[in-house]
């Protein structure tokens, strides 16, 4: 009975739908990046098969038309995948930061009873307009703390995660103050 108590909560549906919609949008924005990673793995597989078929690889005759065709195909897949990864990351990161305030907005709107999934996502985009780079810089400043968590096998997370989340909450509160002054 207690294991299903979460689903009885009146906020569950709004929370679930909002977070699902956020993840779905971010998935769509990450498709070029994922396609680039797929092609990168495929080009790696092609290179491995080539080396298996040509054990004399370092001294292979590059004037052979078959080998030349393979190298051109490999280069196309490899550089195409790198291009897709770079472009995909450039597309994904601004969208990631546009939706970075969704969870905090959700907490605020659930408390007053006006949480709607699409509205919460739109509000997050509005709040972050012009402030995505500042949030990116904040995340870069917190990167050493994540590294410390990693090298301590998660033990340091007990004291570091509250610091990281506090910084993100202070950023959100400051963002609300700035946007309220502008409106």
Residue ranges and their predicted role:
Residues 1-183:
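Hydrophobic alpha-helical membrane segments
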């Amino acid at each position: 009975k207690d294991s299903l108590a979460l689903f009885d909560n009146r906020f569950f549906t709004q929370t679930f739908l909002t977070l699902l919609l956020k993840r779905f949008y971010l998935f769509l924005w990450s498709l070029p990046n994922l396609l680039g990673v797929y092609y990168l793995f495929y080009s790696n597989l092609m290179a491995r098969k080539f080396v298996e078929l040509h054990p004399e690889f370092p001294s292979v005759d590059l004037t052979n038309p078959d080998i030349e065709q393979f190298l051109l195909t490999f280069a196309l897949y490899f550089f195409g995948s790198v291009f897709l990864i770079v472009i995909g990351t450039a597309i994904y990161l601004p969208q990631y930061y546009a939706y970075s305030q969704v969870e905090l907005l959700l907490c605020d709107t659930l408390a007053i009873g006006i949480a709607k999934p699409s509205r919460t996502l739109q509000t997050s985009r509005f709040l972050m307009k012009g402030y995505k780079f500042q949030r990116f810089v904040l995340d870069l400043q917190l990167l050493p703390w994540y590294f410390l968590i990693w090298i301590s096998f998660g033990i340091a997370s007990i004291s570091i995660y509250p610091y990281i989340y506090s910084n993100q909450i202070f950023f959100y509160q400051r963002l609300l103050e700035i946007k309220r002054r502008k409106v």
